[in-house]
Amino acid sequence: MGNYKFRISEMLPNAWFHKLKDVTKHSKPKNKASSSSSNTCSKKKPSSDSLPQHSYFSNSLVANNPPHHNSPRNSLHTKKMSKRKTLYKPSLKPLTPPPLLVSASFNKSKINDQDSSYSLFPAIETSPESFVYSFYEEDDDDEFVEFSNFKINTKNKAFTKQKVKVIDSVEKACTASKPIKKPQKSHLSVKISRDEDDNEYKAEKKYQRQVSSGRKPSAGINLKRVNSPRIQLSGTRRSTSRRSESKQDVLESFAVMKRSVDPKKDFRESMIEMIEENNIRASKDLEDLLACYLTLNPKEYHDLIIHVFEQIWLQLTKTK
């Protein structure tokens, strides 16, 4: 109750208000102009019964609603305010442009044609000067672009260059990822024809059936041993005096599969044993022996076999 304010309208009955209105009409005569203005005001004003008990007014509404009549002071005040508005200019701070590749510029004439709700930069509309913001490429295109119909031109030179670079990088990466086949080092010039390879492969299959199972396989490297270097040779390469011996060698010879911890040593011993048993001294017979070892063993040991064969070849040439 301390903050509550009593009004006269709440304390007096409604009949007293009608009497007071009649007294004011008879006692105070007014001019026609003033009476007409007062009548219009009284018509516009609602009765006290319809008014709410509490009324609140905000300063912002009063400031935003100017009076209807234009006094000379108010007209001067509005002119001063309009002049002041023209003095306020937007700050020319660097706006962060969007990350676009296509050139775009804004013109005041085009922005003013649209509504203020649609405009993206309202500060530019109210300012008296025209501010043009543009983002250019290397080509310096001056085309005006509306953001409603904004589309990126993919036919631009920058896009084509970038695509070409991406394709080149992908192709380079693919070529780098491909395994490069290293050329096999030919330590010794050995000529082997396809027919001889086929014959050697067939002979290998024949003599692998007669594998000896004397030793248990230990952990190591596979090693294949051939007891006769003349498995694939035909009878035309030999003289008639040694044809019978070659037939016996082919019948008696067989391949042995072993696992070795020191393959270099085992290859050397096997080659020396084959040369001594069969009395191999001719260069053609030695080449056939090397070809036989290369075909019966995997490619991983070809370099090692050739290296061992070169050492044996040098020893044979020195003894001669």
Curated annotation (Swiss-Prot):
Cellular compartment(s): Nucleus
Superkingdom of origin: Eukaryota
Where is this chain compositionally biased, Polar residues type? 49-63
InterPro entries, per this entry? DNA_bnd_dom_ovate, Ovate, Ovate_C
* Gene Ontology molecular-function annotations: DNA binding
Tissue spec: Expressed in roots, stems, flower buds and siliques.
Give the GO biological process terms.
negative regulation of DNA-templated transcription
OVATE domain ranges (all copies): 256-315
**GO cellular component entries:** nucleus
Q: A single Pfam family, by name? A: DNA_binding_2
Write out the biased-composition intervals (Basic residues): 76-87
Segments for region (Disordered): 26-94, 178-248
Low complexity composition-biased segments: 32-41, 64-75
Listed A to Z, the keywords are: Nucleus, Repressor, Transcription, Transcription regulation
**Anything else the record notes?**
Plants over-expressing OFP2 show kidney-shaped cotyledons, round and curled leaves, small rosette size, late flowering, reduced fertilization and round seeds.
Assembly notes = Interacts with BLH1, BLH2, BLH3, BLH4, BLH6, BLH10, KNAT1, KNAT3, KNAT4, KNAT5, KNAT6 and KNAT7.
Entry function = Transcriptional repressor that regulates multiple aspects of plant growth and development through the regulation of BEL1-LIKE (BLH) and KNOX TALE (KNAT) homeodomain transcription factors.
Q: What is this protein called?
A: Transcription repressor OFP2
Where does this protein come from, organism-wise? Arabidopsis thaliana (Mouse-ear cress)
